[in-house]
Amino acid sequence: MYLSLLLLPMFGSAVTGLLGRKIGVTGAHIITCSCLITSAILAIVAFYEVGLCNSSVSINLISWIDSELMDVSWGFMFDSLTVSMLLPVLVVSSLVHIFSVDYMSADPHNQRFFAYLSMFTFFMLVLVTGDNYLIMFVGWEGIGISSYLLINFWFTRIQANKSAIKALVVNRVGDMFLSIGFFAIFFVFGNLDYSTVFSIAPFINETIITIIGLLLLLAAMGKSAQLGLHTWLPDPSMEGPTPVSALIHAATLVTAGVYLLLRSSPVIEYGPTTLIVITWVGALTAFFAASTGLLQNDLKRVIAYSTCSQMGYLFMACGLSQYNVALFHLVNHAFFKALLFLAAGAVLHATYDQQDQRRLGGLIGFLPFTYTAILIGSLSLIALPWLTGFYSKDLILEVAYGQYEFSGQVAYWLGTLSACLTAFYSLRLISLTFLTYPNASKSVYLHTHDAPTIVMIPLIILSLLAIFFGYVARDLFVGMGSDFLSPSLFTHPSHITLIEAEFGLPQIIKLLPAIGTLLGAGLALYLYHMLPVFTIDLTNSTLGQKLYRFFNGKYYVDVIYNHYIIYGGLQLGYVISKVLDRGIIELVGPYGLATGLTSGSKDIAKLDTGNLTSYALYLAIALVTLIMILLSPVLLNAALINAPLILVLLVAMVCIPYINSSSNDTVTTVQVKL
């Protein structure tokens, strides 16, 4: 069953990709959707057997690398962490496949799209089920190339090409640090198996553990779009098909970095410096992304920046050693983020791909079902009480404050402020898209229609999960005394603060995020729905324009990267190419050798003057040189006499050909004049 769960998506991808012309579009839909739905059902069964019944499964297929100390097998492990990751990955992926049947119905390349989508899911399954770091690396690189293919699915668009390359290159930075980290793990531990590495980690020097932890953190920052390596995230949401955005942002690519930290918890727990850095990175990313999303106008880009912000919350939880809370929020986030992106796709599908919120408005009467789906997803995103997001997002802030350390306090206040900003831009999105006066052209509203039944099914399922899953699964993931994740995640005893956060915090600290959320949501509705004149006046003011350009321009991070890093790198490459490749290497390489031999042969040819006295001089110089070589032991004692003589002879040898050549030219000139 467990291998079937893993291989079915790959089977669907291979059949659809290789036999797409034979089976047709309908066949591609049936095969890929059937494989994914079956895998999702098997994942639910595996969650019951492994997670609830506490019966972990390990499968060792064949040996892969057996070279002296290095022994790596194709092995897969199903523990509580693995099955918890399989649940959102396969449920969301199967719903995205169903949604794509209608969304991509007019595209002529359906078979290729569904093959890429299933391959993407397969590599994510490889990443989360592998029992060693090398198999994780296979899945890690696989989702990277799959995301490139999906973002660049409409490859005739230059912007899609550029976005795919940008995503691939930025992720290469994280991949480089991941490779170095795995080399460091093998060098220190002598093995890449999780069980071996985790059992030896407590006995390794803290400095070494910190270095390995920081390398893994930098790798996770690339995949999970943390501050500094976040620039690739909005582009796939803009240029790829919307189902791709839902899969990338909800369940696969961006969660891979968080999974790396969760799986490596037995290692990074022994590096306190690493944990502090992770906390700061997460807190700063959450605030940065939330403030950047405030004044974005593209519908999908706003949701994309909310993903970046929520990944910051997950990093905060990992840095605070609350890995079970991070996993709980990861699963919750997958459901309501997939709901938001698929509902946004339904809006785009109904409005002829109009993504600018300012050119929409008034859609609540035309798309009531889609409006309800986006409303549920947004309310769960802002952690409205008793929805799914509330049970995990607020808990992250509580455990941050409950640490009673400086990094925890900073994380709490930045996270609370980010929650206010998240509520603001979420309700701003709803207001501009659905509640304000219609701003689109009349032709758009004439043909606007709500989602068909095949699109409603995924939205209904995700809406129910966004409402009820947090309440149902809370005690299992983060309940007091729950040992559901204890076999998979490790928290050092000195870092256990969940009880203090639950019972020891002042009530105002617990209520403050909810109060800020309500204030942010109310302010957005007031400014954009009830009093838009004030917003227009603020935009026309000098201060308002500067603030708008700053936040809409994403803190000018792309400008800084382009001007100081990319442009500087291109200039450095030009200088290296000019001085080294086309300079020194050419000079000492084939070109320099050929040129030198040609020039030297011409200089030697000038010695053949045809003058008898020149030949006599050459013979005399050769004879003197031979005598000096033979008598060098004796003459070395008279260096002051020997050196000037040698210098005179060398100068004579060099100058004679040119003197002869000059005299010959003079004679020729005189003869011509006569």
Swiss-Prot record:
> What role is this protein assigned?
Core subunit of the mitochondrial membrane respiratory chain NADH dehydrogenase (Complex I) that is believed to belong to the minimal assembly required for catalysis. Complex I functions in the transfer of electrons from NADH to the respiratory chain. The immediate electron acceptor for the enzyme is believed to be ubiquinone.
Catalyses which reaction?
a ubiquinone + NADH + 5 H(+)(in) = a ubiquinol + NAD(+) + 4 H(+)(out)
The compartments listed are:
Mitochondrion inner membrane
EC number(s): the record gives 7.1.1.2
Q: Which family does it belong to?
A: Belongs to the complex I subunit 5 family.
Single Gene Ontology BP annotation: electron transport coupled proton transport
Q: Which GO terms describe its cellular component?
A: mitochondrial inner membrane; respiratory chain complex I
Q: Does the keyword NAD apply?
A: yes
What is this entry's stated membrane topology? Multi-pass membrane protein
EC supergroup of this enzyme: translocase
TM ranges are 27-47, 81-101, 113-133, 135-155, 173-193, 200-220, 242-262, 275-295, 301-323, 325-345, 363-383, 410-430, 453-473, 514-534, 556-576, 616-636, 639-659
Q: What is the lineage of its organism?
A: Eukaryota, Fungi, Dikarya, Basidiomycota, Ustilaginomycotina
> What's the name of the protein?
NADH-ubiquinone oxidoreductase chain 5
Molecular function (GO) terms for this protein are: NADH dehydrogenase (ubiquinone) activity
| Keyword Membrane assigned | yes
Protein's organism: Mycosarcoma maydis (Corn smut fungus)
Residues in a coiled coil are: none
Q: Which InterPro entries match?
A: NADH_DH_su5_C, NADHpl_OxRdtase_5_subgr, ND/Mrp_TM, NU5C-like, Proton_antipo_N
Q: Which UniProt key words apply to this protein? A: Electron transport, Membrane, Mitochondrion, Mitochondrion inner membrane, NAD, Respiratory chain, Translocase, Transmembrane, Transmembrane helix, Transport, Ubiquinone
